């Protein structure tokens, strides 16, 4: 129990009403946020002398201050709790890591609408279908629709400026509305069929297509009948694959599985009776957490923490929790929608539930197996580096450029559980001699570790740099300039043969040079982190270089500023399409005179 916190005095004045409590440490850092029907009763349970779970004991040992907020009822307390958790992400709360919005299929307005992927606020005019649990699930649906009904998926800026059909028309993935190869009536029918599929009305769609096929055959329109036959065949294959499809309504099936090594929540999204896909979540939990607590924390954060998230009419779960009724009331209060939570289900819903449980079990087993493998690599590296315990945080820096152009430095971060992608950083390098990797590394490290000097950010246990003695010396110089506390420096050079497995390693002062066997788990970890840093740097460099090259040619044209360049590229759908346009076509763009259009055309086509 904390020696700096007088729990008896605090509890003597604590209210017995519903509310939210916040626990802080001696440095005023928020440790935990909780809610209670009876604040005094709930908080008293933390300060019992016996029977505390390890996680609770560790929390209580750090408490220096507790603050409470009284609310009108439990529902209000739950809503406030979720707001505070989302804002502060306290370390002792069960946290939902992946809270980004799910993608939707978007169907735009207009005579020839397009299908595409959409995330975020629904501001554009059109229809939204979903949400889909992953980008992969939505791409599968869009691919099927493109093959079956040939509705366009190109951006409007690209569509408006076509003068001949693109490759999608040639491979029978589009009917060419951009150049008038399909009538508005025929295209509208394809769009209507796509909507029926997205709404989950596959059976009705198949029946309608079958009737149309028979009608076309009777009219001796055999080409049209064959087209309809292919569409029906494609739909039936989907229905055969979608063995879980059945029933109606919008349902999310959520199952939680626990293991001493972690937890997994598996979510299956069903809309209109059709399973759209599924996704795994791995919340951080203590060993003693119960399934109901983990599930309740997940559901509250998932459905109350994002007002834009699509809400089903029913949740099917695999464990019970006493606060489900409070969650239902909170959802109705916040979202204005009714919600039911079911545990005992039959038929199709029971199959969905069992599948969610099975998927959660398998995903957790696979994650734990991978984590164990990674832990062995960390332990092996600790042995090689003569550390008392495995490193908890490793950072690796790499530089990428093309002959000095668009130089980007990457910083990737790994912990015992794998890559910490939310901590990844890229640095656009400016003001150095093109191609000077040492100066680029100096700038990147200075920008990164200046935050440590200013009291921000986390200090790694091991710092890797992709390079030999020179890069390692540069890293040492930066750390000394910034007076960064001691940490282990490791340089990774490719060796004379530049083959994987034959890397030369340099430790700290670069005087200690060594190699590791090709089958060394420690070397495999170093390679994994180095390769990830290389990948992250290259993707950043390519994006920066591509952006620069798209605009660099136009920068040579007098009278074209950044805003007009951007508008011009958006109008034509990119520099490539702009280059194909005639001077007359360029002059039709907003804000472009005939004289300026001729100048742009001449610049783009000069040798």
UniProtKB/Swiss-Prot annotation:
High-level lineage: Bacteria, Pseudomonadati, Pseudomonadota, Gammaproteobacteria, Pseudomonadales
Entry's localization field: Cytoplasm
Signal peptide start-end: none
GO MF term list: DNA binding; excinuclease ABC activity
UniProt keyword Cytoplasm, yes or no: yes
Residue ranges of domain GIY-YIG in the record: 16-94
Domain spans labelled UVR: 203-238
PANTHER family associated with the record: UVRABC SYSTEM PROTEIN C, UVRC/OXIDOREDUCTASE
CDD domains in alphabetical order: GIY-YIG_UvrC_Cho
UniProt protein name: UvrABC system protein C
UniProt record similarity statement: Belongs to the UvrC family.
SMART domains for the chain: GIYc, HhH1
One of the protein's GO biological processes: nucleotide-excision repair
Subunit structure: Interacts with UvrB in an incision complex.
Gene it is expressed from: uvrC
